[in-house]
Regions:
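N-terminal targeting signals for export/organelle localization
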Residues: 1-67
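Thiol/disulfide oxidoreductase modules built on the thioredoxin-like
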Residues: 160-167, 171-224
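The canonical Cys-X-X-Cys-His
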Residues: 97-101, 190
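A short beta-strand-turn-helix
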Residues: 55-88, 112
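PAS/PAS-like sensory domain loop/N-cap motif
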Residues: 72-74, 97, 197
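Structural microenvironment flanking redox-active thiols in thiol-disulfide oxidoreductases
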Residues: 86, 101-161, 174-181
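Short pre-active-site segment immediately N-terminal to redox-active cysteine/selenocysteine motifs
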Residues: 85-88, 93-96, 127, 186
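Extracellular/periplasmic catalytic domains that process cell-envelope and extracellular macromolecules
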Residues: 49, 81-84, 114-115, 162-164, ...
Length: 227
């Protein structure tokens, strides 16, 4: 018996079929990507305002050696919103971060204005990127503005940091454990806490996408007032 030949598609029909198939595949892939974006977790930007700040214990440098520091030991747990207890300004930095280098001057200015009403605490992390290889000697020099070459991505002597020496605790977070517990992945970051440790202001919530643009000086004025 003679073998039947498959009927050939008219010229151009096979190209049309391939085009339709490619378009269908592209449409399915686009739909998958869109669903993935919708279902993907929202990037972490730090603790939500109104929640208790994540506590931590680490070594702190205050100008005279390193000693244990627990954030919650400094809270006023009886704060009722009307007492004169101090608020907290929590700053995360990396001594090799160029933005943190520049922010040193603003922090000096803010501390001179608010230091009697706000406890400043700087947490020195070490980001896992090139030329970010800090150590305690560098952290001390960054805080005190003393000579140590290696700050600002190994480009500058720490004595040249903008601003004045910082007269408040610097916390060692070389392992980034505190940074991660706060839901952060980069620096600089700042937050204002109420005297009982409740997060009152989160920089990323206000200055990130969809935020109202309120900056740190404005937030201090609104929340703490009196200046």
């Amino acid at each position: 018996m003679a073998r039947r030949r498959a009927k050939a598609l008219p010229k151009g029909k096979d190209e049309d079929v391939r085009t339709v198939a490619m378009l269908a595949t592209a449409g399915i892939m686009s739909l998958v990507v869109a669903i993935s974006v919708i279902l993907a977790p929202i990037p972490q930007v730090g603790p939500d305002e109104g929640n208790q700040a994540p506590d931590f214990v680490s070594e702190a440098y205050s100008g005279f050696g390193w000693s244990e520091y627990r954030l919650s030991d400094n809270y006023d747990w009886d704060w009722n919103g009307s007492s004169d207890s101090n608020w907290f300004l929590i700053q995360f930095i990396d001594t090799d971060c160029p933005y943190c280098w520049i922010e040193g001057e603003e922090m000096s200015q803010l501390h001179s204005q608010w230091g009697d009403k706000v406890n400043f605490v700087t947490i020195a992390a070490q980001l896992n990127i090139p030329n970010h290889d800090s150590n305690r000697d560098e952290v001390e020099a960054f805080r005190d503005k003393t000579s140590y070459f290696g700050c600002n991505s190994d480009r500058d002597d720490c004595i040249d940091r903008p601003g004045t020496p910082h007269d408040w605790p610097y916390i060692d977070d070389g392992t980034n454990s505190i940074l991660e517990s706060w839901g952060l992945s980069g620096t600089p970051f700042t937050a204002i806490l109420e005297p009982d440790g409740t997060v009152a202001w989160n920089k990323n919530k206000h200055q990130g996408e969809g935020g109202d643009g309120e900056d740190l000086p404005e937030a201090l004025q609104r929340l703490v007032g009196g200046q």
